[in-house]
Amino acid sequence: QQGWQNLQKEIFDSAYSEESYDSAVEVTEYEGEPYVILDGNEPAFTEDEMTTTVYEQYSPLDSYGRCQTAEACVGEELMPDEKRGDISSVKPTGWQSVRYENVEGGSLYNRCHLIAYQLSGENANEENLITGTRYMNTEGMLPFENLVAEYVHETDNHVMYRVTPIFENENLVASGVPVSYTHLPAHETRGNLVC
């Protein structure tokens, strides 16, 4: 088995929830798990949206300055080959830089890329960074970002990837981040979940 297959097996064998929600809006509150499966884990892409042409697209910020949908067709040619730069110049909505000794890594909040730097090479793009808890970032989103990156590196295939943060009312911090991805053309790796 390839590395990406091992990652996928590890993620879904230890799936935190056997329950699958029909949509992200059904997931009303944190249930003690870093992510839950949506729509039977079927990716939310139409046939017309599927492409192997690499691109990335970031929606404009809303009237509160909050990120909206970010989408990409991830391939080797989009992925960076240098380390991520400094992103401290971006202050996403709800940002608070507070350190706690009892929080792993020290920070309760992280600047979270909607489309991970390792997938897109996007650094300090304000349309791609939200305020999220370190837990959501490292336990919820990162395993899937690593899976997609590993898959692309090992197979040289492309992956459709879409992330849309959910903001309740006027809240400046996202209450969840639905992530949908699928490999082209055979859908060997795919997911539809909310972190």
Residue ranges, per PLM feature:
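N-terminal, intrinsically disordered, polar/charged segments of Gram-positive cell-envelope systems
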Residues: Q2-F45
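Betabetaalpha-Me/HNH-type nuclease active-site subdomain
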Residues: M50-N125
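Short beta-strand-alpha-helix junction that forms the catalytic/metal-binding core
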Residues: L119-T138
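Sequence context surrounding c-type heme c attachment/ligation sites in exported
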Residues: M141
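A motif-centric signal for short, conserved binding hotspots located
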Residues: T155-Y181
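Conserved small/polar residues in nucleotide/adenosyl-binding loops
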Residues: T182-T189
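Hydrophobic alpha-helical segments, chiefly the membrane-spanning helices
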Residues: L193-C195
